[in-house]
Every structure is written in structure tokens, then in C-alpha cells.
Amino acid sequence: MRTDTTRGPLVAGLAVALLASPAALAAGPRDCAGLAALAGPDLWIARAEALPAGQLPAENPGRAALTGAARTQAAMPAHCVVEGMIAPRQGVDQRRYGIGFQLRMPEDWNGRFLFQGGGGMDGVVSDAVGAIPVAGATAAPALNRGYAVVSTDSGHQGFDSSDASFGVDQQARIDHAYAAIGRVTETALNLIGAYEGRPPEHRYYMGCSNGGRTALMAAQRFPTLFDGVVAGNPGFRLSRAAIAQAWDVQALNRAAPRDEQGRPILASALTPEDLQLVSQGVLKQCDALDGLADGSIDAMSACRFDPATLTCGAGQTQSCLAPAKLEALRSVFGGARDGQGQSLYSTWPWDAGISAPGWRAWKLGTSPTGTPNARNATLAAASLGLYFMTPPKPGLRLAEVDFSRVAAQTAQTAAINDATATLLSSFVARGGKLLVFHGNSDPVFSADDLRAYWRALGQDNGGEADLARWARLFMVPGMNHCGGGPALDDFDPLAAIEAWVEAGRAPEALPARGGAFPGRSRPLCAYPLEAHYKGQGDTQDISSFECRPPSP
């Protein structure tokens, strides 16, 4: 592998200083337990242990839903694991804070380093194995490929990844927004250098959801740290997405039946049959636009669905949408707006994935009572009130959000949290590569919003062709948040970014499969190209499809 000579002075200086330090010299190469000697006032090391090859426990299902990195029990290679905390301190609320991390370094190291992104509001340190952050992926985790992998809680310790109570602390907000990326990377590189006796030759960042946001942050705010960045379903404009989630809850509650206490039952605003009706309506209108009616809308740009076609006629009560439900859908898909009708968040694309369990889990939930369990409702209430709003509003109820004021209330955190920058000249100049993927049926972060950002990124970077030299976007038809839905959600973005960075092979398309369509393979085309059936050949095989520009 090539050695990159364009490293910034910060990283180079840290590596030299560490390798020359008495503690590092005392530890010696491949002395895992000896890494504990690197602890100091600003670095706690709770564990430094050499582990034999074994089995990795399965990811917590709730956590996996936030990161996409679902996995069954997998074989784990022999490796050194280090766990600790950076910059421990006492916060303004008398809580203990610090940036927790876990680093795993395999015995058969390939010279690569991966920063594994988190999900939700973070607050927990996930197993640093580098699982591919898309639910259907069958590709091996990065650790099994020989990567050294680090993970973090982003600077606070929560009861789970929906806990936003850290938002009352200024430094905790900053750490979660972006600063933990730099601190954890610095520490991980120091530990790798001490253990291996040399720094990594290539450095990568990969995550989905909030981990996708921090992946973009890695490229935008730390442009000299990473060679390649993979951002999946990124919550890049998360402050506005949280507002949109409040908007959606209010819109859907207006169509929902009430419980005995008069509370709206969010999960019943739209039944599974309602969503299946919409999905079938979208497929009927748009499925064949890519040359083949097969349950997947690859010609996403050409799909113009009007839900009014599903309106109940006089005396009709089945296989149609009542006016209140139709209005709720129009409000949600039209995007959040303020009191003057100005857009607060993007529109959403109509796609077949609306009927999938993942869409319902985020937008509606399954609770039969007036206490909702939709992930958007539970996460947004906490994050909007405690993290995004200044001053914080504990106990915020989404039904009380004032859309004429909420943009101003969230502006301060948006300025440090949202990964909306389009000037990435330093990242590009040192050869950085960016690969982004996103589900067209994501119910959390709108695919329309990401497409708008991508167009702006192209406009500010010399146009579409120049942008494609260092950044590629791959839209996944039917896919929900970080996987799931009627989609081909089994692909390997880590292999693609690695080949691009190290061998110069830019990905024109990502080969994809998925459990929703057994035996099928398709290309996920680099945006704005879309997959089309050639008109002949096996309709289940990737070779029968080509990437074409969208129809004018």
C-alpha cells in the first residue's frame, strides 16, 4: 500500500511525540496490557487486554435500528482491545462527562484505521468492529478484514441512545456535534502507534444515520484526518429533521383516533392497509419507468405520484384513503413549514418503502395507546428540547412546538451540529474521497433533502463532473433508514471506498443484493444516473441493467 505524505502537522507531530514518549517505549510494540501506561489526567484507560479469537455478541436490536449495523454473532479475530475515556470532567449539571471510546487492533493488522460512527444521540460505546452500517449487509466487519477500529459515545454517557439530557452542558453539545471526532482520532492514532510501532497507512470513517452526519463532519471539519469517508443515510441537517419530526407527529395526530383520555393514537393515524395502498399506488404509477415492473422504482427522478388518486369516492370505505388521512400524508410529504408558509424542511419522495415495517417504526410506531412509541416521536421530543433548543426545554411535547419560532430556537446548535458545508477544498486537495448512500424511502432524513445538498455541493465545486472526481452519491430504491424495506440493502461501501482511495477505482455503481428480493442483483448507480433494464436478458441479474441519466 502507498504511504501518504500529505498528513497534517497535528497528526504527524502527535505520532512522533507518542512514539518517543517514555510510556510508549516502556509499553513496546504489541504489548497490549502495557498500553495502560499511557493513561494520564486527560486520558483514563479502564481496559487494555489481548483477546483470543472468539465470537462477537450480536448488536442490541434497538441500537442496531439507529446505526444500521445489525449483525448476528460473528467470529472475531485475535486482537487487542483498549477502553477508556478522554478529558473526564464534571459538567454544569454535576454529572460526570468525558469522551468514552473503545479501540480494537487485530493481530493481523492490515495497516488501515476505521472510525466507526454511532447513532441516535450516541451516549453508549458500541463494540468497535466496523460492521457495515446497512441492515442487510453480509460483508465482513472491518475488524475481520484487518482494520483497527475505534468507536465512541461522543462525549456523554446516556441510559441509551435516545437520552439527550447531556444537552444542558455546553461542552457536551460541542463534543457530540463534532469535537469528539478529533479527540478520539488523536487518541486512537496514538494508541495504534504505540502498539504497532507505526501509524496507519490509510484512515477511514464510516457510519449511518447520526453516524452518517458525523462522517460528513469528519470530511468538513477535519479535512486532513481521513483518506476516505462513507456516510450512510446522513442526518446532515439534523436540526431541521428534528423539526420535521415534530411537524409529522402533529400532522398525523390530526388524523388519528383518540383513546379514552382523548389522546391521539399516533400508530392508528394510518393503518398498515393504508400504507400498503399507497405503496401499491406508487408502484402502479412509477414501477415500470425503469423498463421493468419488478417492485422496485429505480427511475426515482421520474416518479410523480399524486395520492389524490386514492381518495375515497362517495360511499366508498375500503381500498381508499379518507380525506383526513390524505391530508395528513400531504402535510408530511410536503415538508415542515413555518407560520408564513416558508419551508423549514424538505419534501419527501413517494416510494414503495412506505409500507415497510421500518417506515412505520419511525413515523407511526405500533403503540395501541396515546403514548406513542414511534422512534421519530421519542427521539425528536428529547433531542429537540434538550439538545437543539437554546435555552433547553426539558419535557418538551411535540404537540406544543411552535413552527413560527422553532428555527430561531434551534439556530445555535444547528451552527455546530449540521454538516451542510460545501467548501471541502482541503479534503479534496489531499486526495480525500467521499461515498454517500441513502434510502429513497428513509422516514427519518429525506432523500429529497440530500439530493438538494448534493446539487449545492456540485454547484460550489465546479459542477457535476468535477464533484464526481472525489464524491459519489448512491440512492437505494425502496430502502428505509440504514436498511430495510423492499430494497437491495446488501452492498459493501467499505470495499468501494478502499478501492477508490488506494487503487484509484472510482465506483460507477455498487453491486447490490437483498433479502427482500431473493436471487436478484442490481447496480446502485452513482447519482444522478439510475438503473434501467436493457430490454433483454435475465431480469434478476445485474448484467441486464445499465446506469442511465434521468429522463428530461
Positions of predicted regions on the chain:
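Bacterial N-terminal signal peptides that target proteins for export
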Residues: R2-A12
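N-terminal signal peptide c-region/cleavage motif recognized by signal peptidases
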Residues: A20-A24
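Catalytic-loop region of hydrolases
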Residues: A26-R112, V125-A128, G136-A137, S279, ...
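Cap/lid segment of the alpha/beta-hydrolase catalytic domain
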Residues: N110, G118-G197, I243-A244, A251-L252, ...
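Gly/Ala-rich beta-loop-alpha elbow adjacent to hydrolase catalytic centers
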Residues: G207-G211, A215
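A catalytic-pocket lid/entrance helix-loop region that shapes and gates access to the active site
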Residues: M217-A219, T224-R337, M475
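Short beta-strand/loop motif that positions the catalytic acidic residue
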Residues: V436-H438
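Conserved alpha/beta-hydrolase "acid-adjacent" motif
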Residues: V444-D448
